[in-house]
A protein has these predicted regions:
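Alpha-helical solenoid repeats of the armadillo/HEAT superfamily
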Residues: 2-14, 24-28, 34-38, 43-60, ...
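Low-complexity, charge- and small-residue-enriched intrinsically disordered regions
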Residues: 17-21
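Internal, Lys/Arg-enriched amphipathic helical interaction segments that engage polyanionic partners
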Residues: 64
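Onset and early core of a folded interaction/catalytic domain in large eukaryotic regulators
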Residues: 83-134
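Short alpha-helical interface patches
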Residues: 115-119, 154-161
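HEAT/HEAT-like alpha-solenoid repeats
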Residues: 123-128, 165-170, 204, 212
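Generic beta-strand or strand-like secondary-structure segments
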Residues: 126-129, 141-148, 168
């Protein structure tokens, strides 16, 4: 990944973290001033060409990184950068930063064109591998992103199925000992994966059957992926199982 893009993403994460901390501090009664100028004691000088950031605020972004920003990194580059942060094994990349990057990634793939780029950018494999992550919140966000990527999108539904993602989602949605929030988010992703896409519905039904849950109509026929009422019955059953987890 481009060095400037990587630093820009890190700066963005730092800025968001600092903003969240600042809001929390202000809400707990931080003193205010009626002076329209800089608050006393902050060390900020209105005429300074390079204001210093104090405390836990982000470090000033250098001109090279700004040039990268104004050069317009594509959303595809931002998707790759976010996934690099999410999967970075380095202890320097904190869990909080990974979750922020996950939020950014999910917002990017809300766009249909960006979701379709997951295959071209080779991002399906790392995303699906995160469904098995040891951290509950990482599994939760991974399932969320999968659900966003395949919602009302047959192209990504096909890729998810081809990459073996449907059995993974069924396993996560029905796994004993898994948290309710992860199971419910996996159920959401599975719902998006099977609607109006019969191959995924058939695989999901087969995987659920293996785990002791029959997904057949009263006459023994398969659930029609285009029948939203019947699909809802299957998904509601999984949601109810998650509640009892």
């Amino acid at each position: 990944m481009d060095k400037n893009l990587n630093q820009l993403l890190k700066w963005s994460i730092e800025a968001q973290t600092a903003a969240n901390a600042g809001q929390s501090h202000h809400s707990h009664g931080a003193p205010t001033s009626n002076n329209s100028g800089p608050a006393a004691g902050t060390g900020a000088v209105a005429t300074s060409p390079a204001p210093q950031v104090t405390g836990s605020g982000p470090r000033p972004v250098d001109p090279e990184i700004l040039a990268s920003l104004f050069g317009g990194p594509s959303e595809a580059e931002l998707m790759k950068a976010a996934m690099e942060v999410i999967t970075d094994p380095s202890p320097e990349t904190t869990r909080e930063n990974k979750l922020i990057a996950f939020d950014n990634f999910e917002q990017l793939i809300e766009n249909l064109d960006n979701a379709n780029l997951l295959d071209q950018l080779a991002l399906w494999s790392p995303l699906l591998s995160l469904l098995d992550h040891e951290d509950e919140d990482m599994r939760y966000h991974a399932a969320w992103c999968v659900g966003t990527a395949v919602q009302n999108n047959q192209k990504t539904q096909e890729r998810l199925l081809a990459m073996g993602g449907v059995p993974k989602l069924v396993d996560l949605a029905m796994k004993e000992g898994e948290s309710e929030k992860v199971r419910r988010k996996a159920t959401y992703a599975l719902s998006s994966a099977v609607r109006n896409y019969q191959p995924a519905m058939d695989v999901a039904a087969d995987e659920m059957h293996k785990r002791g849950h029959e997904v057949l109509l009263s006459n023994g026929t398969k659930v029609d992926a285009a029948d939203m009422d019947k699909v809802d019955e299957v998904i509601d059953c999984l949601r109810n199982k998650a509640k009892s987890a």
